[in-house]
Amino acid sequence: MTEAIIKIRGLHKYFGPLHVIKGVDLDVTSGEVVVVIGPSGGGKSTFLRCINFMEEPSDGTVEVDGLEINAGESLRQQRKSIRELRQKAGMVFQQFNLFPHMTTMGNIIEGPVTVKGWSKERAIDKAEELLSWVGLSEKRDEFPSRLSGGQQQRVAIARALCMEPTIMLFDEPTSALDPELINEVTEVMERLAEQGMTMVVVTHELHFARDVSDRVILMADGGWAEISPPGEFFTNPKEERTRQFLAHIL
């Protein structure tokens, strides 16, 4: 059996008295695409942000590519490990979060130069390769204000990939886009999956979940309602909660 590259055990997250993530476990193997769907307020985005400690879990362990962080211990004493984990876990957000005062190229090379210590020349070479891959070579010198939403999100994907992560996390990457721009982003994500990138994706794009994922998770009320392969999840779900959810959205 393939070793899991992401291992999550007993993950909890509280916001004050509000128990948002309720002790979830998850293993994701190398090259696997796991899609998390579910009703709003179910904890999907918080769960994803806990994987790379953009949100600090209240308890539990998160392991990415052999590096484990224990949220039950002092996170301050694990800051170095958290920084290392974040470099392993690329993240693409709902809002593109590009620096408005930087060009496309500047946005992509900022992380490798300032965080990884790459030379500017090395970072530019890698960025040009990625811009070609996402179909935006001609936009390298444009500022974000001159790009469409779909183009900005493709730049954000290139920016994350330029850090050479071992896994990619996508937090509703198409929900801020006009409908006609969604496909240009999901097509890039599909090609990334075909190349064997390990991905955890929170999305409302059910066609992506159905056609690209290896497993689909229904997350509701801070926990897993169902985890199944997409064929089973969408055509013969095991849980009544899943059937109710699908009946509302299909």
Summary of predicted features, one role per range:
Residues 102-110:
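Short coil-to-helix segment of the ABC ATPase nucleotide-binding domain corresponding to the Q-loop/switch region
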Residues 143-147, 151:
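Conserved ABC ATPase signature
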Residues 162-166:
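A short, proline-enriched helix->beta-strand linker immediately N-terminal to the Walker B motif
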Residues 168-171:
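Catalytic Walker B motif of ABC-type/P-loop ATPase nucleotide-binding domains
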Residues 179-181:
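Helix N-cap at the start of a conserved alpha-helix in ABC-type nucleotide-binding domains
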